[in-house]
Design a protein with these regions (language model features):
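A general structural detector for well-ordered alpha-helical segments in enzyme core domains, enriched
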Residues: 3, 31-35, 64, 68, ...
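A C-terminal functional module that forms or caps the active site or interfaces directly
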Residues: 150-197, 201
Length: 231
């Protein structure tokens, strides 16, 4: 609550990492409900993301979709598209919500699968590019975004050619070392913007009694830096 109250004027979105609530059992679920209810009641203009990375067979995905997008009323949820369109469809069936599909993630292990090349006659492509090509028509830019790691700016222009009008959620800036200048230069275009995520560098800006003020300063610094870049 203190973090939200101190940083909201510098944010367009809050990404709630559900694992840090779920690991606490029923108490954690209650805390997550309190968090999203507080955001929806006090800051309804701020876009909320359930960073849950769900995705399963259709009837199970429907339960996940109902849990986060209906019952908890998040604006969006991160989804793993690995199981295909029928695992994603239940999330898309809920009106006025977004799914955020994993495409190219910021972790070093993304090279193990996402950056593998697929060779076909007269075509060589990365796995992540095939994921985008396959999934971009499951929904459209009014209900689908993509996760693209801020530590991989060399692939942004390639991705923008594939999905010029989809919002990108870009983690990896801040504690993971992504360069905001390179992110903005390569991921933004005249069609649509981006959501740049900075979590640990804001939340853990200080462990002292003034942690909320430190978080506000860290969030404001990010906002100021982005404003300078976008001038």
């Amino acid at each position: 609550k203190a973090i939200i109250d101190s940083t909201n004027k510098f944010c367009v979105s809050y990404k709630i990492n559900t694992a840090f609530y779920e690991c606490l059992g029923s108490i954690g679920w209650k805390s997550m409900e309190k968090t999203i209810n507080y955001l929806n009641k006090n800051y309804p203009e701020i876009f909320t993301i359930a960073d849950a990375k769900r995705g399963d067979i259709g009837n199970t995905s429907k339960m996940y979709a109902d849990a986060f997008l209906k019952n908890m009323n998040f604006n969006s949820i991160t989804v793993n598209p690995y199981m295909g369109s029928d695992s994603v469809k239940p999330f898309l069936e809920i009106d006025n919500k977004f799914i955020i599909l994993l495409a190219l993630t910021s972790n070093s292990g993304s090279k193990d699968i996402q950056l593998k090349k697929i060779s076909e006659p007269e075509n060589e492509n990365f796995v992540f590019s095939e994921v985008i090509n396959s999934s971009k028509n499951w929904g459209d830019d009014s209900n689908t975004m993509y996760v693209v790691g801020g530590t991989k700016p060399e692939f942004f222009k390639r991705i923008r050619k594939q999905i010029p009008r989809h919002f990108l959620l870009i983690p990896g800036f801040g504690a993971q070392g992504g360069d905001l200048n390179k992110i903005c230069e390569n991921a933004m275009n005249d069609e649509i913007g981006i959501i740049v995520n900075s979590s640990r560098s804001v939340i853990y800006a200080s462990s002292g009694n003034q942690f909320d003020k430190a978080a506000a300063e860290a969030a404001e610094n990010v906002q100021n830096l982005m404003q300078q870049i976008l001038k």
